[in-house]
Amino acid sequence: MQVLILGSGVVGVTSAYYLATQGHEVTVVDRREAPAMETSYGNAGQVSFGFSSPWAAPGIPRKALKWMFQEHAPLKIQPKRDPAMARFMMAMFNNCTPERYAVNKERMVRVAEYSRQCIDALRRDTGIRYEDRQRGLLQLFRHESQVEAAGKDMRVLSECGVRHRLLGAEELVTAEPALARVPGKFVGGLHLPDDQTGDCHLFTQRLAEHCREHLGVTFRFGVDVQRIERQAGRVERVVTSAGSLRADAYVVCLGSFSPLLVKDLDIRLPIYPVKGYSLTLPVTDDGGAPQSTVMDETFKVAISRFDDRIRVGGTAELASYDLSLLEKRRATISMVVRDVFPEGGDAAKAEFWTGLRPMTPDSTPIIGATRYDNLWLNTGHGTLGWTMSCGSAHLLADLMAGRRPAIDPIGLDVSRYAA
Protein backbone atom coordinates (compact mmCIF):
# COMPACT_ATOMS: atom_id res chain seq x y z
CA MET A 1 0.00 0.00 0.00
CA GLN A 2 1.25 3.47 -0.87
CA VAL A 3 0.87 5.82 2.09
CA LEU A 4 1.28 9.59 2.07
CA ILE A 5 2.01 11.14 5.47
CA LEU A 6 1.43 14.86 5.91
CA GLY A 7 3.87 16.25 8.47
CA SER A 8 7.39 15.28 9.56
CA GLY A 9 7.30 16.03 13.26
CA VAL A 10 7.89 13.23 15.73
CA VAL A 11 4.36 11.87 15.19
CA GLY A 12 4.68 11.88 11.40
CA VAL A 13 8.13 10.28 11.35
CA THR A 14 7.24 7.55 13.86
CA SER A 15 4.12 6.86 11.77
CA ALA A 16 6.36 6.48 8.73
CA TYR A 17 8.63 4.11 10.64
CA TYR A 18 5.92 1.71 11.78
CA LEU A 19 4.10 1.74 8.45
CA ALA A 20 7.34 1.09 6.57
CA THR A 21 8.32 -1.77 8.88
CA GLN A 22 5.00 -3.38 7.97
CA GLY A 23 5.98 -3.27 4.31
CA HIS A 24 4.14 -0.20 3.06
CA GLU A 25 5.60 2.27 0.56
CA VAL A 26 5.71 5.52 2.52
CA THR A 27 6.21 9.13 1.47
CA VAL A 28 6.36 12.01 3.98
CA VAL A 29 5.84 15.64 2.96
CA ASP A 30 6.53 18.73 5.03
CA ARG A 31 6.76 22.46 4.39
CA ARG A 32 9.97 22.82 6.38
CA GLU A 33 13.50 21.99 5.23
CA ALA A 34 14.04 19.03 7.58
CA PRO A 35 12.17 16.83 10.07
CA ALA A 36 11.08 18.13 13.48
CA MET A 37 11.52 21.83 12.80
CA GLU A 38 8.31 23.02 14.48
CA THR A 39 6.67 21.71 17.68
CA SER A 40 9.10 18.77 17.91
CA TYR A 41 12.13 21.06 17.78
CA GLY A 42 12.40 22.49 21.29
CA ASN A 43 9.95 20.70 23.57
CA ALA A 44 10.66 20.01 27.23
CA GLY A 45 12.45 16.72 26.56
CA GLN A 46 10.43 14.63 28.98
CA VAL A 47 9.14 11.25 27.83
CA SER A 48 6.65 11.03 30.64
CA PHE A 49 4.49 7.94 30.31
CA GLY A 50 3.30 7.87 33.91
CA PHE A 51 2.92 11.64 34.09
CA SER A 52 0.36 11.68 31.26
CA SER A 53 -2.49 13.66 32.79
CA PRO A 54 -5.31 15.78 31.36
CA TRP A 55 -5.05 19.54 31.58
CA ALA A 56 -8.80 19.47 32.08
CA ALA A 57 -8.87 18.57 35.76
CA PRO A 58 -11.21 19.35 38.65
CA GLY A 59 -10.52 22.84 39.95
CA ILE A 60 -8.88 24.15 36.78
CA PRO A 61 -11.61 26.71 35.93
CA ARG A 62 -11.15 28.33 39.34
CA LYS A 63 -7.36 28.18 39.06
CA ALA A 64 -7.48 29.71 35.57
CA LEU A 65 -9.20 32.80 36.95
CA LYS A 66 -6.56 33.12 39.66
CA TRP A 67 -3.69 32.64 37.20
CA MET A 68 -4.89 35.57 35.11
CA PHE A 69 -3.57 37.91 37.81
CA GLN A 70 -0.28 36.14 38.60
CA GLU A 71 3.04 37.14 37.07
CA HIS A 72 4.42 33.61 36.75
CA ALA A 73 1.20 31.69 36.13
CA PRO A 74 1.36 28.43 34.13
CA LEU A 75 -1.58 29.52 31.94
CA LYS A 76 -1.89 32.79 30.06
CA ILE A 77 -4.67 33.91 27.75
CA GLN A 78 -4.05 36.60 25.14
CA PRO A 79 -7.26 38.61 24.66
CA LYS A 80 -8.43 38.01 21.10
CA ARG A 81 -11.68 37.87 19.19
CA ASP A 82 -11.23 34.20 18.50
CA PRO A 83 -14.35 32.00 18.49
CA ALA A 84 -12.16 28.89 18.23
CA MET A 85 -10.44 29.82 21.50
CA ALA A 86 -13.78 30.32 23.22
CA ARG A 87 -15.07 26.96 21.98
CA PHE A 88 -11.89 25.22 23.09
CA MET A 89 -11.99 26.72 26.58
CA MET A 90 -15.65 25.88 27.04
CA ALA A 91 -15.10 22.29 25.90
CA MET A 92 -12.03 21.96 28.14
CA PHE A 93 -13.89 23.27 31.18
CA ASN A 94 -16.68 20.77 30.46
CA ASN A 95 -14.05 18.04 30.84
CA CYS A 96 -13.00 19.25 34.29
CA THR A 97 -15.36 16.99 36.22
CA PRO A 98 -13.94 14.10 38.28
CA GLU A 99 -15.76 11.62 36.04
CA ARG A 100 -14.39 13.02 32.76
CA TYR A 101 -10.94 13.42 34.25
CA ALA A 102 -10.81 9.73 35.18
CA VAL A 103 -11.91 8.64 31.70
CA ASN A 104 -9.43 10.92 29.95
CA LYS A 105 -6.58 10.00 32.29
CA GLU A 106 -7.10 6.29 31.59
CA ARG A 107 -7.07 6.86 27.83
CA MET A 108 -3.89 8.91 28.03
CA VAL A 109 -2.04 6.43 30.23
CA ARG A 110 -3.20 3.59 27.98
CA VAL A 111 -1.48 5.17 24.98
CA ALA A 112 1.51 6.42 26.95
CA GLU A 113 2.34 3.10 28.61
CA TYR A 114 2.11 1.35 25.24
CA SER A 115 4.39 4.03 23.85
CA ARG A 116 6.98 3.19 26.52
CA GLN A 117 7.09 -0.39 25.28
CA CYS A 118 7.31 0.79 21.68
CA ILE A 119 10.12 3.31 22.13
CA ASP A 120 12.16 0.81 24.15
CA ALA A 121 11.79 -1.73 21.33
CA LEU A 122 12.54 0.89 18.68
CA ARG A 123 15.73 1.88 20.45
CA ARG A 124 16.84 -1.76 20.56
CA ASP A 125 15.89 -2.43 16.94
CA THR A 126 17.43 0.68 15.38
CA GLY A 127 20.26 1.48 17.75
CA ILE A 128 19.58 5.21 17.49
CA ARG A 129 20.49 7.44 20.43
CA TYR A 130 19.22 10.92 21.14
CA GLU A 131 20.90 12.02 24.37
CA ASP A 132 18.38 9.77 26.06
CA ARG A 133 18.24 8.78 29.70
CA GLN A 134 16.05 6.18 31.38
CA ARG A 135 16.16 7.51 34.95
CA GLY A 136 12.58 8.46 35.71
CA LEU A 137 10.66 11.68 36.37
CA LEU A 138 10.21 13.52 39.66
CA GLN A 139 7.13 15.70 40.17
CA LEU A 140 7.96 18.30 42.81
CA PHE A 141 5.42 19.65 45.29
CA ARG A 142 5.82 22.99 47.04
CA HIS A 143 2.57 22.69 49.03
CA GLU A 144 0.93 19.94 51.07
CA SER A 145 -2.29 20.43 49.10
CA GLN A 146 -0.43 19.21 46.00
CA VAL A 147 0.64 16.06 47.81
CA GLU A 148 -2.99 15.40 48.75
CA ALA A 149 -4.19 16.04 45.19
CA ALA A 150 -1.63 13.57 43.83
CA GLY A 151 -3.53 10.78 45.56
CA LYS A 152 -6.11 10.68 42.76
CA ASP A 153 -3.45 10.31 40.10
CA MET A 154 -1.70 7.63 42.12
CA ARG A 155 -4.87 5.54 42.19
CA VAL A 156 -5.13 5.69 38.39
CA LEU A 157 -1.42 4.86 38.06
CA SER A 158 -1.92 1.82 40.29
CA GLU A 159 -4.91 0.68 38.23
CA CYS A 160 -2.83 1.00 35.05
CA GLY A 161 0.15 -0.82 36.52
CA VAL A 162 2.47 2.22 36.42
CA ARG A 163 5.25 2.11 39.00
CA HIS A 164 5.38 5.16 41.25
CA ARG A 165 6.46 6.22 44.71
CA LEU A 166 5.53 9.19 46.88
CA LEU A 167 8.66 10.75 48.39
CA GLY A 168 8.96 12.90 51.46
CA ALA A 169 11.02 16.08 51.43
CA GLU A 170 14.11 14.34 52.76
CA GLU A 171 13.86 11.57 50.13
CA LEU A 172 13.89 13.81 47.05
CA VAL A 173 17.68 13.72 46.83
CA THR A 174 17.56 9.97 46.20
CA ALA A 175 16.02 10.74 42.81
CA GLU A 176 17.74 14.08 42.11
CA PRO A 177 20.89 14.65 44.21
CA ALA A 178 21.19 18.32 43.18
CA LEU A 179 18.06 19.13 45.19
CA ALA A 180 20.24 18.88 48.30
CA ARG A 181 21.44 22.38 47.37
CA VAL A 182 17.93 23.87 47.81
CA PRO A 183 16.81 22.47 51.20
CA GLY A 184 13.34 23.30 52.49
CA LYS A 185 11.98 24.37 49.12
CA PHE A 186 9.78 21.32 48.45
CA VAL A 187 7.52 19.31 50.75
CA GLY A 188 7.61 16.12 48.69
CA GLY A 189 7.43 14.59 45.26
CA LEU A 190 6.03 11.80 43.13
CA HIS A 191 8.72 9.65 41.52
CA LEU A 192 7.95 7.72 38.32
CA PRO A 193 11.02 5.52 37.76
CA ASP A 194 10.07 4.29 34.28
CA ASP A 195 9.77 7.72 32.67
CA GLN A 196 12.53 8.88 30.36
CA THR A 197 14.28 11.93 28.92
CA GLY A 198 15.60 12.71 25.46
CA ASP A 199 16.02 15.26 22.68
CA CYS A 200 12.90 14.90 20.52
CA HIS A 201 14.41 16.87 17.63
CA LEU A 202 17.50 14.65 17.55
CA PHE A 203 15.40 11.48 17.85
CA THR A 204 13.13 12.49 14.97
CA GLN A 205 15.99 13.45 12.66
CA ARG A 206 17.88 10.23 13.33
CA LEU A 207 14.76 8.11 12.95
CA ALA A 208 14.00 9.85 9.64
CA GLU A 209 17.53 9.03 8.49
CA HIS A 210 17.01 5.41 9.50
CA CYS A 211 13.70 5.32 7.61
CA ARG A 212 15.37 6.69 4.48
CA GLU A 213 18.42 4.45 4.55
CA HIS A 214 16.94 1.17 5.76
CA LEU A 215 13.19 1.24 5.05
CA GLY A 216 12.97 3.11 1.76
CA VAL A 217 10.83 5.98 3.07
CA THR A 218 10.78 9.04 0.80
CA PHE A 219 10.88 12.49 2.39
CA ARG A 220 9.88 15.57 0.41
CA PHE A 221 10.74 18.79 2.21
CA GLY A 222 9.85 22.35 1.31
CA VAL A 223 6.45 21.14 0.09
CA ASP A 224 3.45 23.10 1.35
CA VAL A 225 0.24 21.08 1.66
CA GLN A 226 -2.59 23.24 0.30
CA ARG A 227 -5.72 21.10 0.31
CA ILE A 228 -7.14 17.60 0.20
CA GLU A 229 -9.51 16.71 -2.63
CA ARG A 230 -12.13 13.99 -2.29
CA GLN A 231 -14.43 11.98 -4.51
CA ALA A 232 -17.10 9.40 -3.66
CA GLY A 233 -16.19 9.01 -0.01
CA ARG A 234 -12.46 8.75 -0.59
CA VAL A 235 -9.51 11.10 -0.75
CA GLU A 236 -8.49 11.41 -4.38
CA ARG A 237 -5.33 13.48 -4.03
CA VAL A 238 -3.45 16.06 -1.99
CA VAL A 239 -2.69 19.34 -3.72
CA THR A 240 0.69 20.80 -2.75
CA SER A 241 3.06 23.54 -3.82
CA ALA A 242 4.92 20.83 -5.76
CA GLY A 243 1.84 19.53 -7.57
CA SER A 244 -0.75 16.86 -6.82
CA LEU A 245 0.22 13.76 -4.84
CA ARG A 246 -1.73 10.51 -4.86
CA ALA A 247 -1.58 7.43 -2.67
CA ASP A 248 -3.71 4.53 -1.49
CA ALA A 249 -3.97 5.99 2.00
CA TYR A 250 -3.31 9.36 3.62
CA VAL A 251 -2.33 10.22 7.20
CA VAL A 252 -2.67 13.71 8.69
CA CYS A 253 0.06 14.41 11.27
CA LEU A 254 0.08 18.20 11.14
CA GLY A 255 -0.36 19.00 14.81
CA SER A 256 -2.09 22.33 15.40
CA PHE A 257 -2.55 22.81 11.66
CA SER A 258 -4.54 19.60 11.19
CA PRO A 259 -7.98 21.24 11.72
CA LEU A 260 -7.25 23.86 9.07
CA LEU A 261 -6.55 21.21 6.45
CA VAL A 262 -9.50 18.88 7.07
CA LYS A 263 -12.26 21.39 7.76
CA ASP A 264 -13.18 21.54 4.05
CA LEU A 265 -13.79 17.79 4.26
CA ASP A 266 -16.45 18.43 6.93
CA ILE A 267 -14.20 16.96 9.60
CA ARG A 268 -14.21 19.07 12.74
CA LEU A 269 -11.16 18.54 14.91
CA PRO A 270 -11.43 20.32 18.28
CA ILE A 271 -7.70 21.04 18.33
CA TYR A 272 -6.42 24.42 19.45
CA PRO A 273 -2.80 25.65 19.33
CA VAL A 274 -1.49 26.15 22.86
CA LYS A 275 1.79 27.99 22.82
CA GLY A 276 4.67 26.69 24.89
CA TYR A 277 8.14 28.06 25.55
CA SER A 278 11.51 26.52 26.29
CA LEU A 279 15.04 27.47 27.24
CA THR A 280 18.11 25.36 26.48
CA LEU A 281 21.07 26.03 28.77
CA PRO A 282 24.61 24.66 28.74
CA VAL A 283 25.45 22.66 31.87
CA THR A 284 27.98 24.46 34.05
CA ASP A 285 28.00 22.18 37.10
CA ASP A 286 27.06 18.54 36.68
CA GLY A 287 26.50 18.12 40.40
CA GLY A 288 24.08 21.03 40.45
CA ALA A 289 22.11 19.96 37.37
CA PRO A 290 19.21 17.51 37.05
CA GLN A 291 20.02 13.90 36.19
CA SER A 292 16.71 13.25 34.43
CA THR A 293 13.45 15.27 34.43
CA VAL A 294 11.77 17.17 37.23
CA MET A 295 8.36 18.80 36.97
CA ASP A 296 7.60 21.78 39.19
CA GLU A 297 3.91 21.23 39.91
CA THR A 298 3.31 24.82 41.00
CA PHE A 299 4.53 26.47 37.79
CA LYS A 300 3.96 23.49 35.45
CA VAL A 301 7.56 23.77 34.25
CA ALA A 302 9.63 20.71 33.28
CA ILE A 303 13.42 20.69 33.59
CA SER A 304 15.18 17.91 31.67
CA ARG A 305 18.78 16.83 31.30
CA PHE A 306 20.41 16.06 27.96
CA ASP A 307 24.14 15.26 27.69
CA ASP A 308 25.64 18.69 28.31
CA ARG A 309 22.45 20.75 28.14
CA ILE A 310 19.42 21.48 30.30
CA ARG A 311 16.04 21.92 28.61
CA VAL A 312 13.42 23.93 30.51
CA GLY A 313 9.90 23.92 29.10
CA GLY A 314 6.60 25.32 30.27
CA THR A 315 3.83 27.91 30.13
CA ALA A 316 0.55 27.41 28.32
CA GLU A 317 -0.46 30.45 26.33
CA LEU A 318 -3.67 30.71 24.34
CA ALA A 319 -2.80 33.10 21.53
CA SER A 320 -4.00 31.34 18.36
CA TYR A 321 -1.13 30.77 15.89
CA ASP A 322 1.06 33.61 17.16
CA LEU A 323 4.72 32.51 17.46
CA SER A 324 6.22 35.71 18.83
CA LEU A 325 8.71 35.23 21.67
CA LEU A 326 7.56 37.10 24.77
CA GLU A 327 10.19 38.03 27.34
CA LYS A 328 7.61 37.75 30.15
CA ARG A 329 7.33 34.02 29.44
CA ARG A 330 11.10 33.68 29.34
CA ALA A 331 11.24 35.30 32.76
CA THR A 332 8.89 32.66 34.18
CA ILE A 333 10.73 29.55 33.01
CA SER A 334 14.11 31.15 33.73
CA MET A 335 12.96 31.92 37.27
CA VAL A 336 11.96 28.30 37.85
CA VAL A 337 15.23 26.74 36.67
CA ARG A 338 17.24 29.23 38.73
CA ASP A 339 15.08 28.45 41.75
CA VAL A 340 15.33 24.65 41.47
CA PHE A 341 18.85 24.22 40.05
CA PRO A 342 20.57 27.55 40.73
CA GLU A 343 24.05 26.23 39.98
CA GLY A 344 23.28 23.80 37.15
CA GLY A 345 23.35 25.86 33.96
CA ASP A 346 24.23 29.19 32.39
CA ALA A 347 20.98 31.08 31.79
CA ALA A 348 22.87 33.91 30.07
CA LYS A 349 23.69 31.53 27.19
CA ALA A 350 20.22 30.01 26.89
CA GLU A 351 18.43 29.51 23.57
CA PHE A 352 14.82 30.76 23.77
CA TRP A 353 12.18 28.97 21.67
CA THR A 354 8.43 28.70 21.25
CA GLY A 355 6.12 26.20 19.57
CA LEU A 356 2.44 25.32 19.23
CA ARG A 357 1.06 22.29 21.05
CA PRO A 358 -2.00 20.72 19.37
CA MET A 359 -4.35 20.47 22.35
CA THR A 360 -7.69 18.72 22.45
CA PRO A 361 -10.22 19.70 25.13
CA ASP A 362 -9.89 16.28 26.78
CA SER A 363 -6.07 16.18 26.37
CA THR A 364 -6.35 12.84 24.54
CA PRO A 365 -4.87 12.45 21.04
CA ILE A 366 -6.96 11.70 17.97
CA ILE A 367 -5.79 8.43 16.40
CA GLY A 368 -7.62 6.40 13.79
CA ALA A 369 -10.01 6.42 10.89
CA THR A 370 -12.28 9.14 9.52
CA ARG A 371 -15.47 9.12 7.47
CA TYR A 372 -13.23 8.74 4.39
CA ASP A 373 -12.05 5.16 4.16
CA ASN A 374 -8.50 6.07 3.08
CA LEU A 375 -7.93 9.10 5.34
CA TRP A 376 -6.43 8.62 8.80
CA LEU A 377 -5.54 10.89 11.68
CA ASN A 378 -2.66 10.89 14.15
CA THR A 379 -2.75 14.29 15.79
CA GLY A 380 -3.86 16.32 18.82
CA HIS A 381 -1.25 15.05 21.30
CA GLY A 382 -0.93 18.38 23.12
CA THR A 383 2.12 18.48 25.38
CA LEU A 384 2.66 14.73 25.02
CA GLY A 385 3.51 14.23 21.36
CA TRP A 386 7.03 13.11 22.27
CA THR A 387 5.75 10.81 25.00
CA MET A 388 2.96 9.21 22.95
CA SER A 389 4.52 9.28 19.48
CA CYS A 390 5.72 5.68 19.18
CA GLY A 391 2.63 4.13 20.73
CA SER A 392 0.28 6.29 18.66
CA ALA A 393 2.15 5.47 15.46
CA HIS A 394 2.27 1.73 16.12
CA LEU A 395 -1.44 1.72 16.95
CA LEU A 396 -2.23 3.64 13.77
CA ALA A 397 -0.17 1.31 11.59
CA ASP A 398 -1.98 -1.73 13.00
CA LEU A 399 -5.39 -0.14 12.48
CA MET A 400 -4.54 0.79 8.89
CA ALA A 401 -3.43 -2.78 8.19
CA GLY A 402 -6.58 -4.23 9.72
CA ARG A 403 -4.58 -5.91 12.45
CA ARG A 404 -5.72 -6.30 16.02
CA PRO A 405 -3.74 -3.64 17.93
CA ALA A 406 -1.91 -4.30 21.18
CA ILE A 407 -4.13 -1.81 23.04
CA ASP A 408 -7.82 -1.00 22.91
CA PRO A 409 -8.39 1.90 20.46
CA ILE A 410 -11.85 2.69 21.84
CA GLY A 411 -12.25 6.36 22.70
CA LEU A 412 -9.22 7.52 20.73
CA ASP A 413 -10.58 8.36 17.28
CA VAL A 414 -12.42 11.50 16.20
CA SER A 415 -15.86 9.90 16.58
CA ARG A 416 -15.77 10.54 20.34
CA TYR A 417 -16.58 14.19 19.61
CA ALA A 418 -19.67 13.37 17.53
CA ALA A 419 -22.10 13.38 20.46
From Swiss-Prot:
Enzyme class name: oxidoreductase
Keyword annotations from UniProtKB, A to Z: FAD, Flavoprotein, Oxidoreductase
Swiss-Prot/TrEMBL catalytic activity: a D-alpha-amino acid + A + H2O = a 2-oxocarboxylate + AH2 + NH4(+)
Keyword flag Oxidoreductase: yes
Biological function: Oxidative deamination of D-amino acids.
Pathway: Amino-acid degradation; D-alanine degradation; NH(3) and pyruvate from D-alanine: step 1/1
UniProt record, GO biological process: D-alanine catabolic process
Family according to the record: Belongs to the DadA oxidoreductase family.
Record's protein name: D-amino acid dehydrogenase
Keyword match Nucleus: no
SUPFAM superfamilies (alphabetical): FAD-linked reductases, C-terminal domain, FAD/NAD(P)-binding domain
Matching InterPro entries: DadA, FAD-dep_OxRdtase, FAD/NAD-bd_sf
EC number per UniProt: 1.4.99.-
Any GO CC annotation of this UniProt entry: cytoplasm
Cofactor (UniProt): FAD
List of residues binding FAD: 3-17
Pfam family, one: DAO
Organism: Chromohalobacter salexigens (strain ATCC BAA-138 / DSM 3043 / CIP 106854 / NCIMB 13768 / 1H11)
GO molecular function, one term: D-amino-acid dehydrogenase activity
The encoding gene: dadA
